[in-house]
A protein has these predicted regions:
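A short, hydrophobic beta-strand/beta-hairpin element that forms part of a small beta-sheet core
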Residues: 148-159
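Hydrophobic membrane-insertion alpha-helices, especially the h-region
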Residues: 2-23
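Short, internal strand/loop/helix patches
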Residues: 106-148
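Well-ordered, non-membrane alpha-helical segments in soluble/globular domains
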Residues: 67-77, 100-107
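Extracytoplasmic
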Residues: 84-87, 146-149
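Thiol-based oxidoreductase modules, predominantly thioredoxin-like and allied folds used
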Residues: 85-99, 116-128
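Alpha-helical transmembrane signal-anchor/signal-peptide segments
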Residues: 24-41
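Short active-site neighborhood of thiol/selenol oxidoreductases, capturing the structured segment around
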Residues: 45-74, 87-92
């Protein structure tokens, strides 16, 4: 009799627990909208936030220190979603960082074997970087190199 009780517990209990958790419904929380008026960079570059889901980042002048961050973003987010037509990564860089940006792109291509078709590195003046960042209206600040470890999600409407 004990044998049947033990076998029942070992077989039925895990099955019941599995069915309980499998029947659950995921209700993901919506992200808060920080601002409705993000500065559209199409005024100063060929890239736009409109009709694109954008991951916006500011690596700053010290791009060499951000290679790990770029690799993590590439592996955790970009690789899953880059085939969507309305998805893009936009990294805003200060003037004069073009060579370092190209090194980062080459390292991402070589190290991860990823198609960087939806990565955009936009090089603009320091004042324009401040304008774009301040339009996000966050509690975060840019460092002295005009960079931040945080990235921001901008939806199709530019919010």
């Amino acid at each position: 009799m004990k044998k049947y009780i033990v076998l029942t517990i070992l077989f039925v209990l895990p099955l019941v627990v599995y069915l309980f958790f499998a029947s659950g419904i995921n209700h993901f929380a919506k992200l808060p909208v920080l601002t409705n008026d993000v500065y559209d960079i199409s005024k100063i570059s060929n890239t736009t936030f409109i009709n694109k889901i954008t991951i916006l980042g500011f690596f700053g002048k010290n791009i060499k220190d951000k290679h790990g961050d770029a690799l993590n973003l590439n592996q955790k987010i970009y690789k899953r979603f880059y085939k969507f037509n309305d998805f893009q990564f936009v990294m805003i860089q200060p003037d004069g960082t073009e060579e370092l940006t190209n090194q980062l792109k080459n390292e991402l291509k070589k190290g991860t074997n990823t198609d960087l078709v939806n990565w955009s590195f936009v090089t603009i003046s320091d004042q324009n970087i401040l304008d774009v960042f301040q339009s996000l209206k966050t509690d975060f600040n840019l460092d002295l190199n005009f960079g931040t470890p945080y990235v921001f999600i901008i939806d199709r409407d530019g919010k």
